[in-house]
Regions:
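C-terminal substrate-recognition/cap domain of FAD-linked oxidoreductases
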Residues: 1, 187, 193, 197-198, ...
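N-terminal flexible segment immediately upstream of the FAD-binding catalytic core
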Residues: 1-29, 46-77, 106, 226-234, ...
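N-terminal accessory segments
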Residues: 1-6, 33-36, 264-280, 369-374, ...
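FAD-binding subdomain of flavoenzyme oxidoreductases
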Residues: 68-224, 413
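Activity-critical C-terminal alpha-helical subdomain
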Residues: 147, 385-421
């Protein structure tokens, strides 16, 4: 048995480092012939065990060497890159041409564009720019039989058949392996204003979001919320403030701080501070600390959900009542209020499977009752693969399974990811 490209052993698995789509295709054909499972590996920043091997007879396709930016086309505002290219590298390449690739998530220096697309990431600027699917112009993918499908193009208008590449965005690699991407760029705004605001109420935070969204719709790029308990860890203060991080981008210099103060005075807001540009990097570094603090302080049960913004207040009230009634859970909430994505995390006392299962059922049931999604931006992976069958309408779930059976009849690609095989 001779592998089509050089491989190494990592634990019980075999790891291959292809340099192009043809080598990926050869690996997939080899895997079919010798009955190996296939697992693509990007930056390994996935939080739901999406890159965790399950079977000893698995080929890990590591995309480290497929990290080339092929073209930055400033006429058509398109950047084309291999799927192992880091998100940060793509952002820098766009910036060098005074353009912007607006998808931005915390581990941008570690995550790869292929992994970002396979989970359809959102991130810190989804409020204004949407998820990564909104910035894809086309993909190249390798199917489970080794067929290479090239959907790359630079066209704004192209109705020459359905956009089949969309099947591979957000499907976590179970329908095919993304090898290259054509991505949309936009002109970079000249000015960027960042504010750290403290208030004492979730409802006031939501009202402020509505005001800013109506007044600065095209310029409001981020509206992050940090609830009192994580705020107390970040800023060494008593746990009663909500901290908001607001970012406004524009081609015109605006005195947004003056507008904010005027709004606060008219609406009798109790605002403790507004920090404008207190080092933008410092403000965003505090936001990134949230992820590390939840690990540091043992908030081990994590829920990545999204809710309609008008449902947030009632949802939080019900969760707080649940916490108060049970006395074994401590909440740690933060999220992207602007796009409805709530990171709803908990410390469990004592941490037992029974208590964690009880908590999970409550949170997920309440999310669905609130017209939300139980998987906002991290995907399902292996860790949450039971959710699709439980919470998707049965017709939708069966349709997804039919697609999987048709595109990957032997279930070689990411078996048990998204749903249990």
């Amino acid at each position: 048995m001779k592998f089509p490209i050089k491989t190494i052993r990592r634990g019980g698995q075999i790891t291959a480092f292809p340099k192009n789509s043809l080598e990926v295709s050869k690996l997939v054909k080899f895997s079919n012939k010798y009955k190996f499972h296939i697992l693509p590996i990007g930056g390994e920043t996935n939080r739901v065990d999406g890159t965790k091997p399950q079977f000893e007879k698995t080929i890990l396709i590591d995309f480290k060497k497929m990290n080339r930016i092929e073209e930055v086309d400033t006429d058509n505002f398109i950047i084309t890159a291999q799927s192992g290219t880091l998100l940060k590298t793509i952002q820098k390449a766009a910036n060098n041409k005074k353009l912007l690739f607006p998808v931005n998530i915390a581990p941008s220096d570690k995550c790869t564009i292929g992994g970002n697309i396979s989970t359809n990431v959102g991130g810190l600027q989804t409020l204004r720019y949407g998820n990564i699917e909104d910035h894809i112009n086309g993909l190249e993918v390798v199917l489970s039989d080794g067929t290479i499908l090239n959907f790359l193009n630079k066209l704004k208008k192209d109705n020459f058949g359905p956009k089949l590449w969309k099947l591979f965005c957000g499907s976590e690699g179970v329908f095919g392996i993304i090898t290259r991407a054509s991505l949309k760029l936009i002109p970079k705004k000249k000015y960027n204003s960042t504010y750290l605001i403290q208030t004492n109420s979730l409802n006031k935070s939501i009202r402020l979001l509505k005001f800013l969204r109506n007044k600065y719709f095209d310029n409001l790029t981020s509206f992050e919320i940090i609830f009192p308990i994580p705020s107390s860890y970040l800023f060494n203060e008593s746990a009663h403030h909500f901290n908001l991080i607001i970012e406004i981008q524009s081609n015109i210099i605006g005195n947004y701080k003056k507008d904010l103060k005027k709004y606060f005075n008219l609406n009798e807001f109790k605002i403790d501070k507004i920090e404008h540009d207190k080092s933008k990097s410092w403000i965003w570094s505090k936001r990134e600390e949230l992820v590390y603090n939840q690990i540091k302080y043992n908030f081990t049960e994590k829920f990545d959900i999204s809710l309609p913004i008008d449902k947030w207040s009632v949802f939080i009230k019900k969760v707080n009542k649940f916490v108060k009634d049970n006395k074994i859970f401590t909440p740690y909430f933060f999220g992207h209020l602007g796009d409805g994505n709530l990171h709803c995390n908990f410390k469990v006392h004592p941490n037992s499977k029974k208590n964690c299962a009880y908590l999970s059922k409550f949170i997920y049931d309440l999310t669905i009752q609130s017209e939300g999604s139980v998987a906002a931006e991290h995907g399902l992976g292996l860790k949450k693969n039971y959710l699709l069958k439980k919470y998707k309408p049965s017709e939708n779930y069966l349709f997804i399974k039919k697609l999987k059976k048709h595109l990957d009849p032997n279930s070689r690609l990411g078996k048990n990811k998204l749903f249990q095989a």
